[in-house]
Amino acid sequence: MNDTIPATGHLLGAADIRRIAADAGISPTKKFGQNFVIDPGTVRRIVREAGVTAADHVMEVGPGLGSLTLAILETGATMTAVEIDPPLAERLPGTVAEFMPEATSRLTVVNRDALTVTPENVPDFSDDASFTLVANLPYNVATPILLTLLERFDNLGSFLVMVQKEVADRLAAKPGSKIYGTPSVKLAWYGTAERVGTIGRNVFWPAPNVDSALVKFTRYQADDPAAPGTANSTDDGTQRELVFRLIDAAFGQRRKTLHAALKTIAPSEAFSIAGIDPTRRGETLTIAEFTALAKAIESCGDGDEAQ
């Protein structure tokens, strides 16, 4: 990975953003959680933290007016931008043509809700070649987008996303923490996450009411001994579904013991097989322990009718 990114293109500043928005008749909307980055230094920092190089294929979700898009293209990478808002999706190629015309052939724009994206409707990512996600995600749907993309794209190898600071803290939280919860554990099924920096409110237009932070994620390799269960295998997802059911139940009643919270899913015998004390709470379990419990339930038979 490159340690530095050459500043070769014209990236968007505050005046550029406001002019583009005015020319296109676009206003940021709360519906889509739109806050546009107006600071070139911030988007270059995001791309640098992501380690993007010219050899990479990048997905961006929610490109907006193109601030981060241009910073990604500046590296020489090929990218696909997924934008839910039709006017913004229509405008983006023109912005790239205006500010970085040599990069237009490396950009594909898909007008689609990221929660509906699949390898079939975004064929650029349908093969086995690994790709990375780099995005300033809409705060209200950041976690669902990440978990959905990781489930549907086995070749999503890493991501660097900017999200609300509180969301970043939860995504990277460890067992035993007060903020450790469903997002933390489910993300840990796929790989490892860490918070790698904070972003102030003044780099956005309009300025949000919350601070932002960067989360970096690396997916487990298929042969990684740290990978829980069959997280990276070609199975039908049955084990993951059971693990996620356990997680949802355990954190849906956070203050209850595992025995109480999981009484309709996990028979008492399963705790013994997994070597897990049923008086513990879900917030103390690692993803490996949730997976061990799921395997134990499977070995006991039908986990739907726990006794």
Curated annotation (Swiss-Prot):
Gene3D superfamilies tied to this protein: Ribosomal RNA adenine dimethylase-like, domain 2 (1.10.8.100), Vaccinia Virus protein VP39 (3.40.50.150)
Chemical reaction(s) catalysed: adenosine(1518)/adenosine(1519) in 16S rRNA + 4 S-adenosyl-L-methionine = N(6)-dimethyladenosine(1518)/N(6)-dimethyladenosine(1519) in 16S rRNA + 4 S-adenosyl-L-homocysteine + 4 H(+)
Record GO terms (molecular function): 16S rRNA (adenine(1518)-N(6)/adenine(1519)-N(6))-dimethyltransferase activity; RNA binding
Binding site for S-adenosyl-L-methionine: N35, V37, G62, E83, D113, N136
InterPro entries given in the database record: KsgA/Erm, rRNA_Ade_diMease-like_C, rRNA_Ade_Mease_Trfase_CS, rRNA_Ade_methylase_Trfase_N, rRNA_adenine_dimethylase, SAM-dependent_MTases_sf
A GO CC annotation given for this chain: cytosol
Pfam family, any one: RrnaAD
Subcellular location(s) per record: Cytoplasm
Disulfide bonds: none
Main location: cytoplasm
Taxonomic superkingdom: Bacteria
Keywords on record: Cytoplasm, Methyltransferase, RNA-binding, rRNA processing, S-adenosyl-L-methionine, Transferase
Enzyme Commission numbers on file: 2.1.1.182
HAMAP family reported for this sequence: 16SrRNA_methyltr_A
Function description: Specifically dimethylates two adjacent adenosines (A1518 and A1519) in the loop of a conserved hairpin near the 3'-end of 16S rRNA in the 30S particle. May play a critical role in biogenesis of 30S subunits.
Family assignment from sequence similarity: Belongs to the class I-like SAM-binding methyltransferase superfamily. rRNA adenine N(6)-methyltransferase family. RsmA subfamily.
This protein's name: Ribosomal RNA small subunit methyltransferase A
UniProt organism field: Bifidobacterium longum subsp. infantis (strain ATCC 15697 / DSM 20088 / JCM 1222 / NCTC 11817 / S12)
